[in-house]
């Protein structure tokens, strides 16, 4: 989940929404280790994701006490499981010596982006706000040998949604290998970030570039605003739905966004 322009705390200003009970979600993950002690609120957590095509698991460090950007969320697990197993969602098949070029928005811990880099394989650019980058770089280092052995790679860049200069810098750095795919997990949560996120998608998701997003419903108003704006610019399809998580009314849903064709253009 991305770092935000506001403090990493759950917003009281939107608590009047009638469907707000899914904001705090359990980290329902296959394998987790934590240190130093279970009672410590500041402990780091190591999460491990075993992907069938890889010889060893992807490992990421989460730091829950640091805020939303440092936690692991259910949609990331869904995205890293579904996308490698569903080749039809990819804009092109990876080829030997020609991995996909992938941008992850709001990377948080980088779990999804790192897993995709190894499993597709891909050259993944993981992006978030500056405070999240040290932990992202740490997680890239944890997995760099696994990624390299699979033919993938990952790098980390700062990217504030809607910042034209920052977006241009990311695009220019990829001139030799333009992005094929943009991905994200659990990035629709604060209403004030909807417009910057839409502007970021408008910038990167063009032509044959697709955006694949795993999303967990939390706030009716925020979802309505995001999908209403998105459908004016993109064709949006549901490509996968997980069953509801235990104790919750919804499970993660995977969407695929492609740019609407302009009239008169093929």
Which residues does each predicted region cover?
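S-adenosylmethionine-dependent methyltransferases
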Residues: 1-266
């Amino acid at each position: 989940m991305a770092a935000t322009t506001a403090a990493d705390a759950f917003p009281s200003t939107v608590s009047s929404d009638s469907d707000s009970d899914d904001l705090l979600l359990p980290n329902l993950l296959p394998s987790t280790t934590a240190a130093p002690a279970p009672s410590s609120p500041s402990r780091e957590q190591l999460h491990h994701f075993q992907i069938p095509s890889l010889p060893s698991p992807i490992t990421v460090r989460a730091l829950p006490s640091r805020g939303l950007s440092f936690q692991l969320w259910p949609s990331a697990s869904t995205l890293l499981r579904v996308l490698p197993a569903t080749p039809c969602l990819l804009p092109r098949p990876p080829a030997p010596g020609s991995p996909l070029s992938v941008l992850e928005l709001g990377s948080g811990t980088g779990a999804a982006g790192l897993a995709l880099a190894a499993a597709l394989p891909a050259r993944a650019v993981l992006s978030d706000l500056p405070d999240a980058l040290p932990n992202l770089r740490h997680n890239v280092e944890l997995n760099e040998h696994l990624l390299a052995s699979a033919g993938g790679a990952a790098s980390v860049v700062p990217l504030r949604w809607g910042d034209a200069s920052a977006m241009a810098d990311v695009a220019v750095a990829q001139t030799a290998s333009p992005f094929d795919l943009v991905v994200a997990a659990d990035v629709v949560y604060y209403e004030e970030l909807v417009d910057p996120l839409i502007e970021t998608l408008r910038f990167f998701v063009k032509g044959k570039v697709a955006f694949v997003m795993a999303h967990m419903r939390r706030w009716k108003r925020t979802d309505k605003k995001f999908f209403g704006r998105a459908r004016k610019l993109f064709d949006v399809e549901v490509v996968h739905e997980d069953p509801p998580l235990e104790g919750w009314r919804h499970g993660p849903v995977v969407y695929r966004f492609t740019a609407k064709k302009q009239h008169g253009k093929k």
